[in-house]
């Protein structure tokens, strides 16, 4: 995978340990501290970028908002999800993510999300834009995704196995055939019942 990323022009940064013992699940957030990065998105390593993600990110860039957030599954109903946000350089005020995370829990399940909800969200909630397919009425500055969901129910943040097959339980059990709230559909596309 590393060689594929390099071939595509990705910059690879190896992390073998950090001062303050920042938990590994927080490492992906450290891009927010990098002064050489102007804009970034954080995604889980087991998800894949897709067109829906791309068009949402493009809409965020045009908006001028500091932080971008995605909620594209019924289980994404949180202020922020660990692998579905992004930002611009300088949008998260000092101290750095590394310093804040060093004082937070380590690699326990959900600690990354609790960190974002408790520590980062209060700092950025007024200068963020969220694309939200299910809970757009619960959080500030939320809006529908700019594209209709694919017929295969693919979603931003969807988990894939190492053979590139999607984890179908996330789709079949929670999304397939379940209409979303009309408030979370674009005004001119109320027919996007699985938006």
Model-identified regions with their sequence ranges:
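Active-site acidic catalytic loop and adjacent metal/ATP-binding pocket
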Residues: 45
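Structured helix-beta-strand junction loops
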Residues: 8, 63-64, 122-126
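Conserved donor-nucleotide/metal-binding helix-loop-beta segment in metal-dependent transferases, i.e.
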Residues: 20, 48-80
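Active-site-proximal specificity loops/subdomain of glycosyltransferases
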Residues: 1-39, 48
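Conserved glycosyltransferase catalytic-site signature
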Residues: 25, 29, 54, 112-114
């Amino acid at each position: 995978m590393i060689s594929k990323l390099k071939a595509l022009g990705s910059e690879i940064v190896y992390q073998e340990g950090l001062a303050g013992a920042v938990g590994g699940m927080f490492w992906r957030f450290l891009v927010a501290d990098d002064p050489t990065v102007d804009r970034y998105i954080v995604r889980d390593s087991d998800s894949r970028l897709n067109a829906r993600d791309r068009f949402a990110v493009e809409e965020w860039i045009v908006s001028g908002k500091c932080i971008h957030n995605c909620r594209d599954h019924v289980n994404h109903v949180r202020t922020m999800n660990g692998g579905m946000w992004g930002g611009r350089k300088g949008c998260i005020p000092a101290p750095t993510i590394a310093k804040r995370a060093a004082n937070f829990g380590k690699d326990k399940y959900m600690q990354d999300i609790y960190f974002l909800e408790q520590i980062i969200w209060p700092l950025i909630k007024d200068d963020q834009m969220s694309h939200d397919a299910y809970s757009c009425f619960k959080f500030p500055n939320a809006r529908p995704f700019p594209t209709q969901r694919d017929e295969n129910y693919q979603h931003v943040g969807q988990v894939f196995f190492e053979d590139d097959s999607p984890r179908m339980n996330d789709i079949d059990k929670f999304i397939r055939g379940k209409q979303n709230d009309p408030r979370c559909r674009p005004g001119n596309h109320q027919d996007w019942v699985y938006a």
